[in-house]
Amino acid sequence: MPGPPATAPPPEPIERPPTPPPPPPEDSAAPPPPPDMSAPPPPPQDELPPAPEPKKKKLGWGSKRPAAAPLSVEELVRKKREADAAAAKPKFLSKKEREKIALEKRAKEVEQSRRKTSTNGASDTASVRSESATPNGVDRTASIPTGPRAMRTSEAPPPPRPRHDSSSNGNGNSNSNSNSNGTVDEDEAAAQAALVKQRYMGAEMTSSFSAKKKRKRTTDRKFNFEWNAEEDTSRDYNPLYAQRHEANFFGRGRLAGFGDDVADGVARKYAAALEDRDREAGSVRAREILEMERRRREESTRNQLDKHWSEKKLEHMRERDWRIFKEDFNIATKGGSVPNPMRSWAESGLPSRLLDLVHRVGYKDPTPIQRAAIPIAMQSRDLIGVAVTGSGKTAAFLLPLLVYIAELPRIDEFEWRKNDGPYAIVLAPTRELAQQIEIEAKKFTIPLGFTVVSIVGGHSLEEQAYSLRNGAEIIIATPGRLVDCIERRLLVLSQCCYVIMDEADRMIDLGFEEPVNKILDALPVSNEKPDSDAAENAAAMSQLHHAGGGRDTRYRQTMMYTATMPTAVERIARKYLRRPAIVTIGSAGEAVDTVEQRVELIAGEDKRKKRLGDILSSGEFRPPIIVFVNIKRNCDAIAREIKQWGFSSVTLHGSKTQEQREAALASVRNGSTDVLVATDLAGRGIDVPDVSLVVNFNMATSIESYTHRIGRTGRAGKSGVAITFLGNEDADVMYDLKQMLIKSPISRVPDELRKHEAAQQKPTRGFSKKNDESSAFGGKGGW
């Protein structure tokens, strides 16, 4: 069958001219222009628009419009792709085309602005006409802004002028003064309102930047205490802060008073005026004025904090300066009414003759113990001096002793004075230390005419009795031999009023506590100080008092010098000293900071001898060198080994006679012997100059003995080295040794000692100290 016939396309309808809309009624207003129109509509014209061209095919009134064909999806997609491709391609515009587009855009903006202006102008004109019809010519609604600030232009009329009935005259005009004041008030109010708005609501983002404004650094931790200048809201508008007064810090009428230059200028002008007015007495008065100004200026420097204590005069020293001075020299004092230390020999208060001897001997600057102890001893105070070895303690007690004796009558004035014993006694633990003190004391006593005698073991009693036949102001002795002399009636202490105990802790360690108590009990009680506050009064203790028998004497003065403070030493101090002043240099029991301490863990005699030979052969240390051992029989064995290595050596121990001891020390001091092998006998108080090395072949049995062993080097401010051979038998002192090495700034703790089990905690159980030197001090003449 044939298919259905193809449908023919419908004929196109004939378009007719559009029918004009009916005219609006007369009473209706014209509709507003559409918002999207870019230009106002053209004015109406009488002519009709031209009719469109007729189409070819026209349909009748009864025919139907054909239905619109639907759009093809493929066609829409194709058009969309073409539009996207055209938009993606860059389109080149020439300069003329770009200028044309810019001009068209600018013309549209100008036209739009003009249209808005004309529209707003019409409304403003209407509001002005309505204002004239209102009573008093004021309309409250007309002054309220009706649009954003951007729509207001200079063409808009100004707001109505306010009228004040109270200030107007009969003609209805406002007073000129009132208007000016009102304007100023309004300006200030507006400015303050703007500042308040800026403070609480924030400044405008476009105008808040200032190059001079301080910015807070997020990485800077320093707090800023200053306000920014822009944060002062009253600086420009409040008359109180409009002009700030800058403070002046110098000159007349200023914050800090007179400057030195201004004060000097005023004083000189005043002095010149006095000279011009009075030719006769004006010059004298002018000099007095200038002298007063100079004194005032010197007095003003008393409170200056920028000067060091060494640059100030003694009368200008303040409490802060003395505190800094004590910290510089590591001086600590305890006790009531303790005087300040002396800064130099000139401020010591010593007599000029004694000061000349001090400079002649070669004492340049006083040591810390001398700075603190001499002023206290000069006030007749009892004293306990705790200082490290080699700190100058000998001169610290000798110089005040000589001043004390110089005020007493000469001992050879009468025969009975010779028989009553010495004025002062100095106790030392060993013979060598006593003889060393005697040598140092004779440097001062021989020029002053005083007699010094040493009483030590090793010499016959007859020889020492012969030395005492003419009397002596000062006796230097060991405790044991002095007790022998007292018991055999060779010596009495009837007029002894000055007692010095040097190395008191060493005397207790050697078992001399009982002899020391016997000596102190043999002193007369008539010149003993009272145990009251009067013992701290320097004026009362320096005066003579009646001692009975028709004689006047001074109070007894007792001084004790030590490196450590064991319990036995404290017990003696509490019994025989009255309200003592305690001076501590550094810390009690610490080694000298100038000594480098080295510790080596070496077990066995042979290994230690080999290590000692390597040290001596290295050439690192120059003689003299001291080697300490614990057992007397090891001294000779080690000395022989040292001689085989090519070094000269001598020994010093308790089995040696006094002549052998003196000869050994003399050979080391004069440089003829390189190495001194000794026991603890030489560990206390013996001063061998320029010792570069101390070797502890055997570790000391106590940390106190170790402290005094290594104190033989690094004396008088010089540096030295101490090497210690340590073994498992020294477990009792390992903890204390480790603590001492930790405190030393120039020493290092070896890993073997740090990790050793015995060095982790202090031993709690007591151990018996073996005194290998006991046989040397026992028996007749042993002391």
Swiss-Prot record:
Q: Which domain of life is it from?
A: Eukaryota
Q: Where is the short sequence motif Q motif located?
A: 343-371
**Which GO terms of the cellular component aspect does the record hold?**
cytoplasm; nucleus
Where composition is biased (Pro residues), the residues are: 1-52
- One Pfam family from the record: Helicase_C
The record describes its quaternary structure and partners as:
Component of the U5 snRNP complex.
Protein name, entry field: Pre-mRNA-splicing ATP-dependent RNA helicase prp28
Annotated source species: Aspergillus terreus (strain NIH 2624 / FGSC A1156)
